[in-house]
């Protein structure tokens, strides 16, 4: 089966994102196709490169990166939701006083059109 995962919970403070990550890993282990993971609402905070947990906590940002690199899973972030929550790409900060963005490079900024396309080609969409 083809899946799209929609993450609407932040990296820390709720279990939405960590549960979504574990679900994605299970899909891959069970030989399902994971088309993409789309981060929306507070889920865009998963793409904040400044997320640094303490040494005894699970590093969800690194886990998403490994999922992307090892399994070629596309990680889409809603650019509008991200900018409203202060997650900004380097290329988008030219008209601000900020020197560097905090958008992790292995995520891709996109709009809701990408989510709609992912839903269209998937058998299932699962929201966390």
Swiss-Prot record:
InterPro entries: DsrEFH-like, Sulphur_relay_DsrE/F-like, Sulphur_relay_TusD/DsrE. Pfam families: DsrE. The keyword tRNA processing applies. One of its GO terms (cellular component) is sulfurtransferase complex. It is an enzyme of class 2 (transferase). Its EC number is 2.8.1.-. This is Sulfurtransferase TusD. The lineage of its organism: Bacteria, Pseudomonadati, Pseudomonadota, Gammaproteobacteria, Enterobacterales.
């Amino acid at each position: 089966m083809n899946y799209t995962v929609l993450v609407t919970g932040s990296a820390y403070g709720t279990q939405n994102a960590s549960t979504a990550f574990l679900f994605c890993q299970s899909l891959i282990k069970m030989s399902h196709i994971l088309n993409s993971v789309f981060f929306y609402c507070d889920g865009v905070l998963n793409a904040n490169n400044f997320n640094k947990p303490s040494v005894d906590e699970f590093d969800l940002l690194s886990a998403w990166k490994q999922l992307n690199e090892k399994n070629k899973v596309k990680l889409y972030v809603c650019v509008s939701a991200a900018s409203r929550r202060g997650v900004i790409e380097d290329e988008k900060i030219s008209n601000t006083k900020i020197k560097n963005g905090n958008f992790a490079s292995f995520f891709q900024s996109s709009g809701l059109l990408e989510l709609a396309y992912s839903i269209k080609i998937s058998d299932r969409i699962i929201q966390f």
